[in-house]
Amino acid sequence: MIKWFLIVFGLAFIALFAGTLYVRLASHDPAQWHVDPETVTEVNSDNQYRDSADVTGDRATVIARLSQVLTGEVVGGTWDSGFVTLVVRTPLYGYPDYVSVRVVEASAEMSRVTIFSRSRFGKIDFGANKKRVETILTALKASPDSAS
């Protein structure tokens, strides 16, 4: 009986370990994940969230601030272009979430920031993507360069 328990437990552990390795080592296809947050059509489901805000500051200033607030591995675009996609990993298991950002200068003093965050795996994210987007936008609005 104990022998079978150990075998089942060992197989379950191996499966969990293999799944964790797959999630952590899965490649990122920019063609699939680097999408324009302003024009993407599938948004605000249970595992993704999109929002935008006007932020005080010219485009270069807002991009510089955003690159400090949002950290992760760039998988598409560049910060300098104002259109970038990053993979951000969850703290416990390292699940990849993709965050696409576009910064457009609305006027000499204002920039429009649009963020689309989504999970690669799973059907629900328990609000993690919404929280991420709202936290980033709040930080940008509260920065010293932003008065609104």
What are these regions (language model features)?
Residues 2-9, 18-148:
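Ser/Thr-rich, low-complexity intrinsically disordered terminal regions
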